[in-house]
Swiss-Prot record:
The lineage of its organism: Bacteria, Pseudomonadati, Pseudomonadota, Gammaproteobacteria, Chromatiales. The modification Phosphoserine is found at S130. This is Siroheme synthase 1. Its EC number is 2.1.1.107, 1.3.1.76, 4.99.1.4. Then it catalyzes the NAD-dependent ring dehydrogenation of precorrin-2 to yield sirohydrochlorin. Finally, it catalyzes the ferrochelation of sirohydrochlorin to yield siroheme. SUPFAM superfamilies: NAD(P)-binding Rossmann-fold domains (SSF51735), Siroheme synthase middle domains-like (SSF75615), Tetrapyrrole methylase (SSF53790). It comes from Halorhodospira halophila (strain DSM 244 / SL1). NAD(+) binds at E22, A23, P43, V44. It catalyses: uroporphyrinogen III + 2 S-adenosyl-L-methionine = precorrin-2 + 2 S-adenosyl-L-homocysteine + H(+); precorrin-2 + NAD(+) = sirohydrochlorin + NADH + 2 H(+); siroheme + 2 H(+) = sirohydrochlorin + Fe(2+).
Length: 484
C-alpha cells in the first residue's frame, strides 16, 4: 500500500485551485461541496469556472493573476490544474516547502496526495483509487459501486448518526454496540429506511434498542474457520462473513498474511501457529484461550489453514468448547491437499492412474515417521503426506521398505496456491536430495503416486518462484510412462 486512505475535514478551510479550465472547475466544485472556501488562481477563467463562480458567491473567489510562490501560505490544501508544466511544478515545490498537501491533476509524481473517485451517499462516502496507476479502472469500479448502492443508503447513514449517542449511552460496551448495529443494518429497520419508510425504520430501531437493554450482555461465540490453502480467493463466503465480524482472531502460521488482511481491522490478532515443534502456544493453552475469550463476550475467530478437521486439531478444540457450553460454528475450508493438487496439476485420482487417495501425516514418533504403520501401499494410489518435509528422506525410505519401487513418482508442492508456489518433481529415490538442493521450505505437502507424472502436462499454475522447466526433473527411470 503506497497511499494511506484518509478523509479530510475541510469545512471553512481555505483551499487553492491553480488553473482556470475544466479540470480546475471540477476540482473546485468538489472542494465547495466539502464546505471549503476556494480560491481560483488563474489570469483568465474558461466558461466552466465562470459558471461555477456565478453559482457559488461568497465561497469561491478568483485571483486574476498567475500563481507565485507565497500564495499558498495559510492554505489547508492546494490543487494544481493549470495544465502548464512550469506552473504545476512551481505549485508543487512551493507547497512541499511549506508541508501543504498538494495534488497536480494527472501528475502523481508532483502530488503528495491522490484524489480518489468518489461514490457519494452523504454522509456515507466511498472512495476508489489506483494510486494514479490506472485512473480509468478506478472510475469503472466506482461506476459499478454506484449501481450497487441505492441513494437511500445516505438516509440510513443519517439515521444511524442521529441515534449514535443514544445507542452509546444505552449499550456502554463497544462490542455489544457493534453487534447491535450489525443487527440493525442486516434487518428490518434498514430495509424500511431503504424502502423510503424512514419513520418506520426509526421506530424499529428504538424497539430493538429497548429490547437489547432488557437482556443480559450477549454471550461470546467461537468461529472455527478453515482458511483454505493460501489464495484468499479460495475462501468461502461464510468464512469471509465471519472474519469480518470477529472481535479477536487466533491464527495459525499456515494462514497466509493476505488472509489476515480480510479480518475486521479492529479485531485483536493473536498468533498461535506451530512450526517444527516450536509452538507459540501449546494446544492445551489454545483450547483454554478460546474458552476464556468467549466467556468474556468476544466473538472469537479461530483461523486455521486448509480445513480445520483435516490434521488441524479442530476436533480437539471444539471438544473443549462443548465441555464448557460455549456456542461455536465450524466453517470447512478447501484442504491443503485439494489446493496443492489442483494448482500443481496433479490429480488425486485419475481413471488411468490412481483409483484411490490416502491422506497421511509424516510426523515423527519415537524419532521416526510412522509410514510403516499404514502399509501396505499400492502403486495405483495417490498418497498426500502432511508435515512430511522435515522427515522427507526417512518418509521416502520407509515407503520403499514397504514395497514401493525407488522409481515411484513423488513431488513436493510448497506454498500451494500462492504466487510463491513451487513444485519439485522426482521419485522416492531422488526427491529428498532435490528438495534440499532447491531449499524448499514449509508449508509443503508431499505427493506420491503415478499422477505426479501428469504435472508437466496439467500444471496450469506457475508461481513466481517455480522452475518453469520442472518437467525435466521427472526421473526417466520411472517405468509407468504417460498415456496419451
Amino acid at each position: 500500500m503506497h497511499h494511506y486512505p484518509i478523509f479530510l475535514k475541510l469545512h471553512g478551510c481555505r483551499c487553492l485551485v491553480v488553473g482556470g479550465g475544466e479540470a480546475a472547475a471540477r476540482r473546485a466544485g468538489d472542494l465547495l461541496r466539502a464546505g471549503a472556501r476556494v480560491e481560483l488562481i488563474a489570469p483568465v477563467l474558461a466558461a466552466p469556472c465562470e459558471q461555477l463562480l456565478d453559482t457559488s458567491p461568497g465561497e469561491l473567489h478568483h485571483r486574476a493573476e498567475p500563481f507565485a510562490a507565497g500564495m499558498e501560505e495559510g492554505a489547508a490544501l492546494v490543487v494544481g490544474a493549470s495544465g502548464d508544466e512550469a506552473t504545476d511544478r512551481t505549485v508543487y515545490e512551493a507547497c512541499r516547502a511549506r508541508g501543504i498537501p498538494v495534488n497536480v491533476a494527472g501528475r502523481p509524481s508532483l502530488s503528495t496526495y491522490i484524489t480518489p473517485v468518489q461514490v457519494d451517499r452523504s454522509p456515507l462516502q466511498l472512495a476508489v483509487s489506483s494510486g494514479g496507476a490506472a485512473p480509468v479502472l478506478a472510475r469503472q469500479i466506482a461506476s459499478r459501486l454506484e449501481t450497487l448502492l441505492p441513494a437511500a443508503y445516505g438516509r440510513l447513514a443519517r439515521l444511524a448518526g442521529r441515534m449514535r449517542e443514544q445507542v452509546r449511552v444505552a449499550l456502554p460496551d463497544k462490542d455489544w454496540r457493534l453487534r447491535f448495529w450489525e443487527q440493525i443494518f442486516d434487518g428490518a429497520a434498514a430495509e424500511s429506511v431503504l424502502a423510503g419508510r424512514e419513520a418506520e425504520g426509526e421506530a424499529e430501531l428504538l424497539r430493538l434498542l429497548e429490547q437489547e437493554q432488557a437482556r443480559p450482555a450477549p454471550q461470546g461465540e467461537v468461529f472455527l474457520v478453515g482458511a483454505g490453502p493460501g489464495d484468499p480467493d479460495l475462501l468461502t463466503f461464510r468464512a469471509l462473513r465471519l472474519m469480518q465480524r470477529a472481535d479477536v482472531v487466533l491464527y495459525d502460521r499456515l494462514a497466509a498474511p493476505a488472509l489476515l488482511d480480510l479480518v475486521r481491522k479492529e479485531a485483536e490478532r493473536i498468533p498461535v501457529g506451530k512450526r517444527r515443534g516450536r509452538h507459540t502456544l501449546p494446544q492445551e493453552r489454545i483450547n483454554e484461550r478460546l474458552v476464556e475469550l468467549a466467556r468474556a463476550g468476544k466473538r472469537v475467530l479461530r483461523l486455521k489453514g486448509g480445513d480445520p478437521f483435516l490434521f488441524g486439531r479442530g476436533g480437539e478444540e471444539i471438544e473443549g468448547l462443548i465441555e464448557q457450553d460455549i456456542p461455536f460454528q465450524v466453517v470447512p475450508g478447501i484442504s491443503a491437499a485439494q489446493g496443492a493438487a489442483s494448482y500443481a496439476g496433479i490429480p488425486l485420482t485419475h481413471r488411468d492412474y490412481a483409483q484411490t487417495c490416502r491422506l497421511l501425516t509424516g510426523h515423527r514418533r519415537a524419532g521416526h515417521p510412522q509410514m510403516k504403520a499404514h502399509a501396505p501401499y499400492r502403486q495405483d494410489e495417490t498418497l498426500i503426506i502432511y508435515m512430511g518435509l522435515v522427515n522427507l528422506e526417512a518418509v521416502c525410505e520407509q515407503l520403499c521398505e514397504c514395497g514401493l519401487p525407488p522409481e515411484h513418482p513423488a513431488a513436493v508442492v510448497a506454498q500451494a496456491t500462492t504466487p510463491q508456489q513451487r513444485v519439485v518433481l522426482g521419485n522416492l529415490r531422488t526427491l529428498a536430495e532435490r528438495v534440499r538442493a532447491e531449499r524448499v521450505e514449509s508449508p509443503a505437502l508431499v505427493v506420491v503416486g503415478p499422477t505426479v507424472q501428469l504435472h508437466p502436462r496439467l500444471g496450469w499454475y506457475r508461481g513466481e518462484a517455480e522452475d518453469r522447466d520442472a518437467a525435466a526433473s521427472i526421473d526417466p527411470c520411472w517405468t509407468g510412462g504417460m498415456r496419451d
